[in-house]
Each structure stands twice: as C-alpha cells, then as structure tokens.
Curated annotation (Swiss-Prot):
It comes from Pyricularia oryzae (strain 70-15 / ATCC MYA-4617 / FGSC 8958) (Rice blast fungus). One of its GO terms (biological process) is maturation of LSU-rRNA from tricistronic rRNA transcript (SSU-rRNA, 5.8S rRNA, LSU-rRNA). Residues 264-489 form the Helicase C-terminal domain. A motif (DEAD box) lies at residues 201-204. The gene is DBP9. This is ATP-dependent RNA helicase DBP9. Residues 31-44 have a biased composition (Low complexity). InterPro entries: DEAD/DEAH_box_helicase_dom (IPR011545), DEAD_box_RNA_helicase (IPR050079), Helicase_ATP-bd (IPR014001), Helicase_C-like (IPR001650), P-loop_NTPase (IPR027417), RNA_helicase_DEAD_Q_motif (IPR014014). It comes from the Eukaryota.
Amino acid sequence: MKRKLNENNEPVLVSGTNKKKSDTEVSSAVANATPSSEAASSSSFADLGLDPRLLQAVAQQSFQKPTLVQSKAIPLALEGRDVLAKAKTGSGKTAAYVLPILQAVLKRKQINPGATYISSLILVPTRELTVQVTKEVERFSAFCAKEVQVVGLTDKVSDAVQRSLLQSSSPDIVVSTPSTAWRNVDSGALSLDKLTHLVLDEADLVLSYGYDEDLEKVARGLPKGVQTVMTSATLTDEIDTLKGIFLRDPVLLDLEEPDAEGSEITQYIVKCGEDEKFLLAYILFKLQLIKGKVIIFVADVDRCYRLKLFFEQFGIRSCILNSELPVNSRISVVEEFNRNVYDIIIASDENEMMGDEDRPAPNGDGKEEAEVDKKHENEDEGQDGEASKAAPRPKKKRKMDRKRDKQYGVSRGIDFKNVAVVVNFDLPLSSTSYTHRIGRTGRAGQAGMVLSFYVPKELFRKHIPTSIDSAENDEKVLARVIKQQKKLGREIKPYNFDRDQVESFRYRMNDALRAVTKIAVREARTRELRQELLKSEKLKRHFEENPAELQHLVRHDGELRTARANPELRHVPDYLLPKEGRKGLSAAEIGFVPLRKSSDRQKKGRFFKKGGARSFKAGGRKPDPLKTFKAKRKTK
C-alpha cells in the first residue's frame, strides 16, 4: 500500500490505488463507532479488562487512571489490531503496549502452561531505552513473575553470552535494539518462528539511527499474522516507511490530549555572549539560584568536559552523560540520578543533533512545508535541515565520532525522574529537538523550568576559546522555537537579572576559564573514559550477580582534576553578594572579643621568645656554635 503525506503531514492513500479500506484514524475525539471506541472511554484500568495481577501492579505504580493514549490503545491492542500511536513525550506510551503484551502472555500460559517460547519482541532505538523498557515490563509483571520472563539485551557482551542468556532463561518477551536483535536472529539464538507481538517504540528515531537494514532483515523473518504496535512522538516520513513494512490495516491514533504537561513548564531565554554562558552557569549553580535536579544539554562531548572542569574550579559537583562512555556506566548514571544520588547531569545531545543535520530537507528549501505545517513537533523540518547544514562539524571532531555509540540517546525516550530544570546551555539545531529536550521536565503534572542560552549574531565568535559553530544559527532556531511554542499556547519569557551584579563575578569566571585549556579537556576525556571502563566492569559483574538491584554504588561525579586548581574560587566572598544575600553578622552574633591577647597566645609568644622554636630573625646575627655547643662527659 503506497502512501504519501498530505498538507497536514498525515499519511494518506495515493490517488489511483485500489484498497478495500484506509487506515482507521482516531483523534482525541472518537472517530468511528466501534466496540473498541466505546471501551476507549474507560476512566479506570479496571474497565479495560486486564488481568487482576496486572491491575495490582498498576496500583502499585500509583497510576490513578489511564492516560489518553492508554485508554485508546490498550482496548485496540487487546482486540488484536495493529496500532500506530502518536502522542507526546511522557504520555504513557510504554504502558500502552506493555500491558496488552503481558495480558496476551498470561492468557496463553493459562491455556498451555508448559509452552515456553519468545512471543513478543520490543525494538527500541537506544540501549538506555532498552534498560528502561525492560524495567517497566518487570514492574508491571511483578505479581506474575513466575509466569512471565523478560530479557533485555543491553550489555556489550559477546554473542555467545547473549545466546546462553536467551536459551537458559527461555523468555517470553525480549527487549533490544534492532541491530542486536537481528544479530541474534541471524546466529539462531533468537527465534521468531512463534512471535505473536512486535513493538517499535520511538519509531521515528529507529530509522534515523541507521537501523533500516536491520529492520528489513527482521521483517523478512517475521511469521504471518504478527500483531504490531508502533509508538512515536511525531509523524514523519520514517513512520510512513515503517508502516508500509510492518503494519497491516492499522488504527492510527493521532492524540492531542489536554496540555497539562506543557502548561506546567515555565520557559525562559537569555541573550548572552559565548563566554557569558559560563558566567551565568557559575552564578546560577554556585549561588543556588536553581534548585532541584537539573539536566544541562550541551552540543558535543568536548563541551561536556569543558563545563564539568569549569564547575570543578568552584566546587560544583556534576556527572557526565555522553556517547563515549560505556553503556553500563550510562545506565548507572541514569539510575542513580533517578535515585537522587546526583543533582546535575551534563548531557551531550550530539546524536540527535547529528540526526537533524544529516536529514535532507524535504521539498527543496522547506518553505512550502513551513507555510502549511500544522504538526507542532515537525514544524519547519526542512528549514531545520538548512540551519544544521550551515553549521558543519569541524574536521578534527570527525575523528572522535568513530568512538561514539550510535545506540546512544538522551533527549528522547529516557525517563529522567523529578527533573526540576532543563538548561539548554547550547541551543539545539531544530525546534523538534527543543521540544524533546523540554519534555524531560514538567512530567506527570509536576512543575518544571527551562532556561535556554542563545548567542546573537553580533556576539558570535567574540570569544574564540568558548565558541562553537552551531551558535551561528541560534537566532534562526530561536525564532522557529518561539513560533512553535506560540502555536501550542506557551510563552517563552526573557530571564531578567541585574547585569551589574553579574559582572562583578566575571574576574573569577575568567580565572576558571583560563585553567580549562584544550589539553586539560583532552586529558579529562581520556581519564574519564579509562575510569568509567573500570567502573563498567565492576557494574557488569554486579549486574550478573544481582540483576534485581543496584546497591553497589559507583560514584560518577568525582573530580577529574586535569585543570589547574584555584582553591580560592570555591568560596564566594560576601562583598560579591548583593545586599540582600550577604551574611553580615550582627554584634550579638559575633560575641565577646577581649582587648588583650588570650592566655594561650601569650604562652605561645613567651615560647618563641625563649627560642623554643629555634627561629632566627631575618638579618640577625647567627649564634656561635662553639659557645652554644653543650656536651656531657661520658660516664664509665
């Protein structure tokens, strides 16, 4: 079935094709009067017809009622329909496909308890998302753990180890990236002969991460009649391609639920120079003007370490998340951040930015699409491609790209819990990336704040040591971001502060930046990678011995100490603080101060006068050793 996108960026049938039935589209209002649509209006999980053990697990997760995507998708999936669900980040898409899969496994085990085979395959774009989805399946199957077995293929282990894991545990559900899944299918470790359910989570990212060949090979190995569920935050050309490969007469859920998430997010922008980014970051975190858990997004790996070393100068602890770190270390960082071990994560978003950079602009320049685009998260995609192409990566950094993990992603899919603030230290290259970044905060009705730094054209390249190429397009990207957020009914406000007060801290910022040299950054990358490789081996052994818990904590926010240390920068003197924030002590708080020296100081003075410390005055006369020498006669 051939399809194309209409002016609303929605898949439609190509004129002239003869098909019995087009895709069934269900928007926020129920479109067709099927039995499933009536069930979709359920106000509780009990109305969805789930197993009591699953309902008990749902209650344990403190889920009060199903979200819009859950109430629409779960009944359709239980009926055996193929589903393509488009809903915003944080709307509960994972539970929307996990619960029907578990229901099908439990139903099959009741009919044939002895049948053990892989019946469900969940494909995700990143290793971090593999771990997250595996844990979600384990949580929802907590009260039926004996009947349901799940395996997540995440660790960078040999094929032989993965084969033994799949054969020994006899899982019902496998979670993996497409490349890892196909490698095991090709080796015979993963059998798809009896597969009944297939899930493509974050489907719009799967192709952009370069899994097209792996997906085609997996599709050729699927048996007939496999039920497929695809979830995505956006509807793009990639989705249309995947739909033609995997789905048969799917139900399209294009859901726009009440914007509770976005309404809780307060967005601010700051116009600043390239070096002023570091100045503002120092003030915000050292003076604790930002409180709570924070994710700081930067453009690349070098910026990660430069900002971390800069923070170290002032005693600000932070940990790093980028594609060069071992997968076990990345998983550990996310897990411990969610358990409140760390408060600040500096995350590089280079994979998503590279994806936008490499994506060709549709319709040439993309102007026509910008005029008729009504999909908020895909707005001006062609212009985003132009902006990203205008800022190519330096050739020196291309060598470093080879070490990066293509299966790394941080701004999409990963469930960071209780994030209070998202700081766009470097503005992304597209409005779509901005939308996904701010989706890390303000989740589940909680309040959140987004603070974005942007460099105007007149300040670009004014401070070479801290300059990056992508900052040249900050104004263009910001204009599209503001336009996109305005369509969503959100406002981006300027972040107001007293610039005179900020300038008084500049000399301290300059001292810290001078210490963070290119050599220090390069040594920090090498040292951090070496340390994390050792930690990763410890974590891998611990995961093998204790798969259900992670009590062995390995700190990831230690100091790298490759930059020259300035201990005096760790303390902020009172005279730099505004009058309202000074620690001025009253006379009552100071206490009694005697006029004369205390007795212990007097004793110390007498001791030095007598020559107890054998200290001589500068320029004074040295004692004659013949006169001062004393010796006692030896007694027999």
